[in-house]
Regions:
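Hydrophobic/aromatic residues located in beta-strands of well-ordered beta-sheets
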Residues: 19, 84-86
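A short SAM/SAH-binding and catalytic strip from SAM-dependent methyltransferases
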Residues: 49-65
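Class I SAM-dependent methyltransferase SAM/SAH-binding core
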Residues: 5-40
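Short strand-turn motif at the edge of the Rossmann-like AdoMet-binding core
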Residues: 9, 87-91
Length: 131
């Protein structure tokens, strides 16, 4: 039997039973202490079936290079058809604007730039929408 992991990345104090809870700080008894801007992540290729990123992505990857490395790591550790659940504040909401720890707005369009099917479609049709 192959058992795939479920990760709660950047969990902070939101420890979820049945998930490997990962955070940069070990303030809340996390399962794995790891900085999500440090590569590679301590997980095998294709070993994860689900990832929760709840109000995490807007806090990491300030430089485009680091942000792209983060997405590449998620791709590397996820098995085919893995589910990644992303929760983020709206970039125009006061909570996003007023929080100095928010380093980048995350939008659906911005994330769609990394969807393989869309990139192949854009490549085929000619528009320069790929990163």
């Amino acid at each position: 039997w192959i058992i795939f992991m479920k990760l709660n990345l950047g969990c902070g104090n939101k420890i979820i039973e049945g998930y490997v809870n990962v955070d940069k700080f070990d303030l809340y008894n996390v399962n794995v202490k790891h900085d999500l801007e440090t590569f590679p992540y301590p997980f095998e290729d294709d070993s994860v079936k689900e990832i929760i990123l709840s109000h995490v992505l807007e806090h990491i990857g300030q430089s485009p290079e680091i942000f792209i490395k983060i997405l590449k790591e998620l791709y590397r550790i996820c098995k085919n058809q893995a589910l990644i659940k992303i929760s983020i504040p709206h970039p125009r909401h006061d909570n996003f604007i007023s929080d100095p720890t928010h380093v980048r707005p995350i939008t659906i369009f911005g994330l769609s730039l990394f969807v393989r099917d869309l990139n192949e479609k854009w490549e085929k049709n000619g528009p320069a929408n790929t990163p």
